[in-house]
């Protein structure tokens, strides 16, 4: 974390770069707690996921609108994320998002409605895959196949507890494909 004084306010910047490469027959599940930006913070994350044929990958990333219990919803300066997924050398998925609450105004509809928590998950499986069909009624969840063997989940949740339920269901569906999956929790 890099801190710098801007005017009379403290400005905190955090950058995170992640790069994962899976060789053929490798099996990895990556999931972490949600990023929770605090007031005046700036967060920039870049993730690259590379897999060879025959590998299996589960990837989960989540965000909150801020430290809600501290009244800091949508008070961060910047939340920026880029996720790239490559199968072999082919770019199969690219997602970029940039949220600047101060620039976008309080009435911006991208505030995700009543949902202060959101997540994306990717699942790359060499075999057929069946995602869960029922999710918490308190959430909004969509699952799509975006490329051969690559599945995307997007979800909106009212709180961290509901998000964990969705994450648990998603991870269970991955483990059904291969019970020998290795997991990393950040």
Cite the ranges covered by each PLM segment.
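Short, structurally constrained coil/turn elements
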Residues: 4, 51-53, 137
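A structural signal for small-residue-enriched, beta-sheet-centric alpha/beta enzyme cores
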Residues: 61-186
């Amino acid at each position: 974390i890099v801190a710098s004084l801007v005017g009379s306010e403290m400005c905190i910047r955090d950058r995170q770069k992640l790069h994962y490469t899976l060789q053929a027959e490798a099996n990895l599940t990556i999931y972490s707690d949600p990023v929770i930006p605090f007031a005046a913070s700036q967060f920039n994350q870049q993730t690259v996921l590379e897999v060879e044929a025959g590998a299996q990958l589960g990837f989960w990333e989540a965000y909150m609108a801020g430290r809600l219990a501290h009244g800091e919803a949508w008070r961060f300066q910047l939340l920026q994320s880029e996720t790239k997924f490559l199968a072999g050398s082919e770019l199969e998925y690219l997602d970029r998002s940039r949220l600047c609450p101060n620039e976008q105004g309080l009435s911006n509809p991208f505030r995700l409605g009543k949902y202060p928590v959101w997540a994306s998950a990717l699942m790359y499986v060499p075999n057929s895959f069946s995602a869960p069909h029922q999710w918490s009624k308190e959430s909004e969840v969509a699952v799509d196949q975006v490329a051969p063997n690559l599945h995307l989940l997007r979800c909106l949740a009212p709180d961290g507890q509901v998000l964990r339920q969705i994450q648990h269901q998603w991870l269970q569906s991955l483990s059904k494909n291969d019970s020998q999956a290795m997991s990393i929790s950040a």
